[in-house]
From Swiss-Prot:
Quaternary structure note: Homopentamer.
Family: Belongs to the MscL family.
Record protein name field: Large-conductance mechanosensitive channel
Originating species: Burkholderia orbicola (strain MC0-3)
Xref: InterPro entries: Mechanosensitive_channel_CS, MS_channel, MSC/AndL, MscL_channel
Record has Acetylation as a keyword: no
Its membrane topology: Multi-pass membrane protein
GO cellular component, one term: plasma membrane
Length: 143
């Protein structure tokens, strides 16, 4: 019975609940960032680079089998057929997703830190030499 009680206390603590909410919101936010990159940023980059589509950029590492019936210029078709290919275009897209997500999280943390009240610093401890001088002064006053 004590294990169940301990688990309840652990699960209901603020940190665990905050983490759960953060993971859920993070998952939803990740989808928004993916859409922004895929649907808004990458098409603009494609136009600026003359119609370059990063999602389909790859380097063929193996040979295409004669029985291959898909499009040899399609990374997804080659992957589905088991052909070895290095998909650097997908990596570029994911890297852009990461940079955008990291920047947005940085801005959020910066904003939250601004909202927090600065903690008052504890008064600095009196240096030992000052304490000693005060003791000497007090001792001399008593004489």
């Amino acid at each position: 019975m004590s294990i169940i009680k301990e688990f309840k206390e652990f699960a209901v603590k603020g940190n665990v609940m905050d983490l759960a909410v953060g993971v859920i919101i993070g998952g939803a936010f990740s989808k928004i960032v993916d859409s922004v990159v895929k649907d808004l940023i990458m098409p603009v980059i494609g136009v600026l680079t003359g119609g370059l589509d990063f999602s389909n950029k790859f380097v063929l590492l193996g040979t295409i089998p004669p029985s291959f019936k898909g499009n040899p210029d399609s990374f997804k078709d080659l992957q589905a057929a088991g052909v070895a290919a290095f998909g650097y275009g997908s990596f570029i897209t994911v890297a852009i997703n990461f940079v955008i997500l990291a920047f947005i999280i940085f801005l959020m943390v910066k904003f939250i830190n601004k909202l927090r009240k600065p903690e008052e610093a504890a008064p600095a401890a009196t240096p030992e030499d000052i304490v000693l001088l005060r003791e000497i002064r007090d001792s001399l006053k008593q004489r």
